[in-house]
């Protein structure tokens, strides 16, 4: 799956199997564990699930990755990640224990894993994801997705 984010960067690392819609109410920890499992079970890009999980949660300890506007971008770089990987979750219920600068609990979570060797590329993608989700219309279109297929269609519309 390839799609374009504003600014012309292709997110060549996102796979349809890594896009989910979650209807159950979940805590921040549950969502992150779910997404980590999703990436590890559906790709061969994570060589050590325990280390990747530890890095994701350690990053959260440094400060929230909730960027506001109902969006969170948990991310980590570690040696056991072979290439950049993205997973997207749309939640029916906001994550009530996920801190954000504007107190708007996340309903969209983009999990990003990257190898230590791709630091600048990783930062470029994180910056573009953040910029893209500042657009209210983009966020609304994602949040209005009724199911996984609609969510995929909306993600494919990024940058058009």
Label every model-predicted segment.
Residues 1-160:
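Cytosolic covalent-transfer regions centered on His/Cys nucleophiles
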